[in-house]
Amino acid sequence: MANQEQIIEAIKEMSVLELNDLVKAIEEEFGVTAAAPVAAAGAAAGGDAEAEKTDFDVELTSAGSSKIKVVKAVKEATGLGLKDAKELVDGAPKVIKEALPKEEAEKLKEALEEVGATVELK
């Protein structure tokens, strides 16, 4: 069995897509979720949770008809390689970027929608 240092080193060398797949596999294997417990507590606090939200996740829900343009836009926005960006777009719905300020998230959403993608802010 690998020790903690070996596991951490293996994780350091994984791509974003590989890490995403790893998280999903861990969630399924152990019946847990990687969702932040703070978000659940904030939602229970009352109706002001939406007004206070400052960080947004940009989720690609569909690539639309011009998938090549969307792959290029995702590659540019995330800094991923072409193969990883294509896998991310092919696997939609997927979160492209997490915890962005509202203005930056809206700019990314607009840029992706301009090339034909369907995008949601969460």
UniProtKB/Swiss-Prot annotation:
<dbReference type="Pfam" id="PF00542">
    <property type="entry name" value="Ribosomal_L12"/>
</dbReference>
<dbReference type="GO" id="GO:0003735">
    <property type="term" value="F:structural constituent of ribosome"/>
</dbReference>
<dbReference type="GO" id="GO:0006412">
    <property type="term" value="P:translation"/>
</dbReference>
<comment type="function">
    <text>Forms part of the ribosomal stalk which helps the ribosome interact with GTP-bound translation factors. Is thus essential for accurate translation.</text>
</comment>
<dbReference type="Pfam" id="PF16320">
    <property type="entry name" value="Ribosomal_L12_N"/>
</dbReference>
<dbReference type="GO" id="GO:0022625">
    <property type="term" value="C:cytosolic large ribosomal subunit"/>
</dbReference>
<protein>
    <recommendedName>
        <fullName>Large ribosomal subunit protein bL12</fullName>
    </recommendedName>
</protein>
<dbReference type="InterPro" id="IPR036235">
    <property type="entry name" value="Ribosomal_bL12_oligo_N_sf"/>
</dbReference>
<dbReference type="GO" id="GO:0003729">
    <property type="term" value="F:mRNA binding"/>
</dbReference>
<dbReference type="InterPro" id="IPR013823">
    <property type="entry name" value="Ribosomal_bL12_C"/>
</dbReference>
<keyword id="KW-0689">Ribosomal protein</keyword>
<dbReference type="InterPro" id="IPR000206">
    <property type="entry name" value="Ribosomal_bL12"/>
</dbReference>
<keyword id="KW-0687">Ribonucleoprotein</keyword>
<comment type="subunit">
    <text>Homodimer. Part of the ribosomal stalk of the 50S ribosomal subunit. Forms a multimeric L10(L12)X complex, where L10 forms an elongated spine to which 2 to 4 L12 dimers bind in a sequential fashion. Binds GTP-bound translation factors.</text>
</comment>
<dbReference type="InterPro" id="IPR008932">
    <property type="entry name" value="Ribosomal_bL12_oligo"/>
</dbReference>
<comment type="similarity">
    <text>Belongs to the bacterial ribosomal protein bL12 family.</text>
</comment>
<dbReference type="InterPro" id="IPR014719">
    <property type="entry name" value="Ribosomal_bL12_C/ClpS-like"/>
</dbReference>
